[in-house]
């Protein structure tokens, strides 16, 4: 009983029997904040400053630059096309004797090649018979459709390989620049956070 009497609250602190309001009184604002109360605000300010610096640093290192692929030549010039055609024509002249010998042995190939040559050379004029056509019409075409297709295929393949090499070179350069910027940004963040602290074996 004695222990119970000493532990029991007095009537002044009982919310049901006290004449004052049972609601708790709000904390009154202090005129001058203490050092303990100022610690969370300073920590929050430091955290916000670190986040803002972290958000601004990538923009500083990774600036928006124009695309490097705009400088790549997108079209072949007339001189390049003419040079490539001449080179391909020289290659095909070396193989022409093989094709002629094959056409002489196989008559079906000569009959297939005649329509292609006719399409390239064009029909004869309606006023002149086929036997007495002009000297220009009697000339054989330089290339058949099959040869033109081979030339175009080779030119496209060479152009594709060149564009692929340029693309790989530019891509590797940009990846190296981004990696260097990332390493520098990470180093700056580490030095900003742990640079002022003394080095220890624990860290």
Swiss-Prot record:
Coiled-coil regions listed: none
Primary site of residence: nucleus
InterPro entries: Akirin
UniProt entry tagged with the keyword Protein transport: yes
Gene Ontology terms, MF aspect: protein-macromolecule adaptor activity; transcription coregulator activity
Processing after translation: Polyubiquitinated. Polyubiquitination is dependent of UBR5 that extends pre-ubiquitinated AKIRIN2.
Modified residues (Phosphoserine): 18, 21, 57
Superkingdom of the source species: Eukaryota
Residues spanned by motif Nuclear localization signal: 22-27
Places the protein is found: Nucleus; Cytoplasm; Membrane
A biological process term (GO) from this entry: positive regulation of transcription by RNA polymerase II
Keywords: Adaptive immunity, Cytoplasm, Developmental protein, Immunity, Innate immunity, Membrane, Nucleus, Phosphoprotein, Protein transport, Repressor, Transcription, Transcription regulation, Transport, Ubl conjugation
Motif range (SYVS motif): 200-203
CDD domains, alphabetized: akirin-2
PANTHER family: AKIRIN-2, AKIRIN-RELATED
Biological function: Molecular adapter that acts as a bridge between a variety of multiprotein complexes, and which is involved in embryonic development, immunity, myogenesis and brain development. Plays a key role in nuclear protein degradation by promoting import of proteasomes into the nucleus: directly binds to fully assembled 20S proteasomes at one end and to nuclear import receptor IPO9 at the other end, bridging them together and mediating the import of pre-assembled proteasome complexes through the nuclear pore.
Name of the protein: Akirin-2
